[in-house]
Amino acid sequence: MKKLFALALALCLLCGAALAEETPELNWSNIPEEVQANGALQQIAAPDLPVIVYWVPANMTAVDPSTVQADPAPAAVFMTEDGQYTISVFALNVTSLQEYLTALEGAGNKLNNVTINGIDCVSVEADAYEGVIVPMNDTLVLSFVCTPKDGDEDWDQVKGVIFSSIQVAQ
């Protein structure tokens, strides 16, 4: 009886561990059409790689990336009229994906695996921003960064829609 109980306990622990490591999924198809219609899909492309599209709300306009002082420079920037909320997209060449993620985590950022529209990604929660890293290959990542990290309740929902929209162009 003790062996049976021990086996049952071991199975419960294994199942619990497997469930705890389940990767969250975000899907554009789960976003209501009326929300999707309140913005537009933008795209970013890199040579020899698939085109990635992402949603930008109608209240944000494109900003010339060369006017943004950031190192590295972003590939695309969108901002509200008052400049309070921004979406920046960076195309980053990295030594390796694992080294890049290790460095981010070592800098105190919280990383979590997430699947977005079938793409294995990594969410990043930093002091000043929330973002998503989309690995294009082992040495190129797209980093979607939303600032500020903490805004009003609407901004939190908008960030969720932006991140849920990231997908390979059809």
Predicted regions: what is each one?
Residues K2, A6-A73, C146-Q170:
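N-terminal targeting sequences that direct proteins away from the cytosol to non-cytosolic compartments
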Residues P65-D152:
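Conserved polar/disulfide-associated segments of primarily extracytoplasmic proteins
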